[in-house]
C-alpha cells in the first residue's frame, strides 16, 4: 500500500509540474520574451514518462497529461492530441527497445528527435483530419525543437532526482531494463 501511495504522489507531482510548465509556456513566456517561440517543456516530461515508465503506465499517464494540457491550454481537439501521443509513444517505445542507455545524453537526443517527430506527426494528422489544418511555420517549429532540446537536460535531471527522492523504483522501468546499446 505504501508503494502505491508513493507512486501516486510521484505522478501527482509530475502532473502538477507539467500543468504549471504548460501554463508558463502558454502565458508567462510571451510576457518575458514576446513572440519568441517557447520550448515544449511538457513534451520533455511526456518523453521522460515514455522512456522511464512501463508501457501501460506510460500510456495512461501520457493520456492524462494530454487531457490536462489540451483542456487547459490548447484549442486542439483531445482526440488529435491523443492520436499524436499514441503515435509518438509507439515510435519512441520501438526505438527504446532496440537501443537505450539511461542518462542525460540519450535524453537530449531523444528530446530533439521526439520534438521534431511531434511536429511532423501533428502537421500530418492536422492536414488529414481538420477542416482548418495547422500551418507549417517552419522557423517557429525549428526554434521550438532546438529550445526544447536545450531545456531537456535540466528537465531530465530534475525528473530523475524526483524519482530518486520519491523512491519510485516501481515506476522507473530503466532500473530493471538492461542496457541494450552495449554489444555483447
Name what the model sees in each region.
Residues 1-184:
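Terminal, non-globular segments
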